[in-house]
Curated annotation (Swiss-Prot):
Gene: fabV
Organism per entry: Idiomarina loihiensis (strain ATCC BAA-735 / DSM 15497 / L2-TR)
The keyword Lipid metabolism appears for this protein: yes
Catalytic activity: a 2,3-saturated acyl-[ACP] + NAD(+) = a (2E)-enoyl-[ACP] + NADH + H(+)
EC number: 1.3.1.9
Name of this protein: Enoyl-[acyl-carrier-protein] reductase [NADH]
Associated pathway: Lipid metabolism; fatty acid biosynthesis
Residues binding NAD(+): 48-53, 74-75, 111-112, 139-140, 244, 273-275
């Protein structure tokens, strides 16, 4: 079939297998052109391995440190008439490239929140990997089924305490407009913490620990975005921020739980980027379009792979990593420093429907959005008849 992007709201409902493979290859190439990670990981579990920061983590571990990677994701496979999700094609491309490079890998497609997938992962590790020395937790999901109660919880993106009116950008209609978000109820907050907080990260690491498959001095990290003033009402001081705070609690719990292994558990704060997750959050498309403009002018713009390679070399595999007062690793400093934020805030005050395309880097935003789904690459023929059925 000939595959062109079908965009609905903040999501693209199809993806291109050749373009997704190109996206993966470019990230692999970036890592290959960098120095190998000194004393890097050898056996890595990436929970949420198929897109965004999780995919970049898997690529960095495999191609930067020759690690054996086990990836867990939840992706739809293709049919004769329908493309797979981008994460499916990304994983297929990763398999192909890792295979060519002689690297060991395995992927499990299923609900990472479930006990069954945790057990399947443990079985694979026992049979094929021995002990894991790095666990990356990079899940973004709107829903989670509690494995104990069977109840399904849904996360919401709402401010806490009071109604919040702000500017946002509708990518579908190419429109800057005001949006008013009603405050979260206590139930909204609790549900969002249940889905996006640290509980499942804890369950994973505890299950691995109880099964005896974590190595001594093992590290684990979960990803967060903390942001600054402009994003605080919808991020930091909002339901999602409350869930991310719960990651800090989980990190402390895990260190205590696994003290026999001298486990290190970090929450890693990364920069705002176009991902399938961030596209869904009000305010973020406009904010990201502005930070892309400012950071590209400053020469500090980074994508997922640049961020994660630095996280590995400057954070996780640095004998003396810099931590904040809560013990977190930060790779977001190029975005969150006062000078850069002041420039972004000035643009935010000025931006309207009329001047948006002059003040913001919408082209950069839109191109990266398309790249997530395998579209918009200049060296891919989008008029070619492609078989959507790619297996892995």
């Amino acid at each position: 079939m000939i595959i062109k992007p079908k965009i609905r709201g903040f999501i693209c409902t199809n993806s291109h297998p050749v373009g997704c493979a190109e996206n993966v290859k470019r990230q692999i190439e970036f890592v290959r052109n960098k120095p190998a990670i000194t004393n890097g990981p050898k056996n890595v579990l990436v929970i949420g391995c198929s897109t965004g920061y999780g995919l970049a983590s898997r690529i960095t571990a495999a191609f930067g440190s020759e690690a054996h990677t086990l990836g867990v994701c939840f992706e739809k496979e293709p049919t004769e008439k329908k493309t797979a999700t981008a994460g499916w094609y990304n994983t297929a491309a990763f398999h192909q490239e890792a295979n060519k490079a002689g690297l060991a890998f395995h992927s499990i497609n299923g609900d990472a929140f479930s006990d069954e997938i945790k057990q399947e992962s443990i079985d694979y590790i026992k049979q094929n990997m021995g002990k894991i020395d790095l666990v990356v937790y990079s899940l973004a999901s709107p829903k989670r089924k509690d494995p104990d109660s069977g109840e399904v919880y849904s996360s919401v993106l709402k401010p806490i305490g009071k109604q919040y009116t702000t500017k946002t950008y509708n990518t579908d209609k190419d429109q800057v407009h005001e949006v008013t978000l009603d405050p979260a109820t206590d139930e909204d907050i609790a549900n969002t913490v249940k889905v996006m907080g640290g509980e499942d990260w804890e369950r994973w690491v505890k299950a691995l620990h109880n099964a005896g498959v974590l190595a001594e001095n093992c590290q684990t990290t979960a990803y967060t975005y903390i942001g600054k003033k402009l994003t605080l009402p919808i991020y930091g001081h909002a339901t999602i921020g409350r869930a991310k705070e719960d990651l800090d609690r989980a990190a402390s719990e895990l260190v205590a739980e696994c003290d026999d292994l001298n486990l290190k558990a970090y929450v890693s704060s990364l920069k705002a980027l176009v991902t399938q997750a961030s596209s869904a959050i009000p305010v973020m498309p406009l904010y990201i379009s502005l930070i892309y403009k400012v950071m590209k002018e400053e020469g500090t713009h980074e994508g997922c792979i640049e961020q994660i390679y630095r996280l590995f070399t400057e954070g996780l595999y640095n004998s003396n990593p810099e931590l904040d007062e809560a013990g977190r690793l930060h790779m977001d400093g190029y975005e969150t420093n006062d000078k850069t934020q002041a420039k972004i805030e000035a643009l935010w005050e000025q931006v309207t429907q009329d001047n948006f395309h002059q003040l913001a880097d919408y082209e950069g935003y839109h191109q990266e959005f398309l790249h997530l789904f395998g579209f918009g690459f200049d060296n891919v023929d989008y008029d070619a008849d492609i078989d959507p059925k790619v297996n892995w």
